[in-house]
Amino acid sequence: MRFSKVVKVGDVLLGGGNKIAVQSMTNTRTADTDATIKQIRELEGAGCDIVRVAVLDLSDAAALKKIKDGIGLPLVADIHFDFRLAVAAIENGADKIRINPGNIGGENNVTRVLDCAKAHGVPIRIGVNSGSVEKCFLNSYKLSLIHISEPTRP
């Protein structure tokens, strides 16, 4: 069996010999806390272990505190374009954040997010897509990325 590091997201352990956790994402406006809590409770009833919400502005980030109080699942904040949203999400109780370092404004901003996450013990999922990778890197690594993404066949 391949070794993997255990990461704690709320009270759910990922990796190592732990069971596979089911994660889903809401499609409500996160600042609409009543609708978001209702949908998360439905996801929990369907067997979801972790839930992710979009944090598009500071009102979404501020809503995380109320949402956390109304649910029993670990809460992941999906951050786009602004490092301040990541910091606010962590400070409002996110159990994990998902960022794309290519679109939150440079190394200094990424460092600020990392420092905040470390101070609060919050893990970060790094999600990068080709739209946020500088063209010179994309062209240099395109072939190897295609090779990596191809499934291995026996």
Sequence positions of predicted segments:
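Active-site mouth loops of central-metabolism enzymes
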Residues: K19-A35, A54, L73-F81, F137-L145
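Structural preference for beta-strand elements that scaffold enzyme active sites
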Residues: K19-Q23, I50-R52, P74-V76, K96-R98, ...
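Active-site beta-loop-alpha junctions enriched in small/polar residues
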Residues: M25-N27, A54-L58, H80-R84, N100-I104, ...
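Glycine-rich, proline-tolerant flexible connector loops at the mouths of alpha/beta enzymes
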Residues: N27, D32-T33, E44-K66, P101-G106
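Alpha-helix-loop-beta-strand connector modules within alpha/beta enzyme cores
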Residues: L58-A77, V113-I124
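Hydrophobic or amphipathic alpha-helical targeting/insertion segments
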Residues: R84-R125
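Residue-level detector of conserved catalytic or cofactor/ligand-binding positions
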Residues: S144-P154
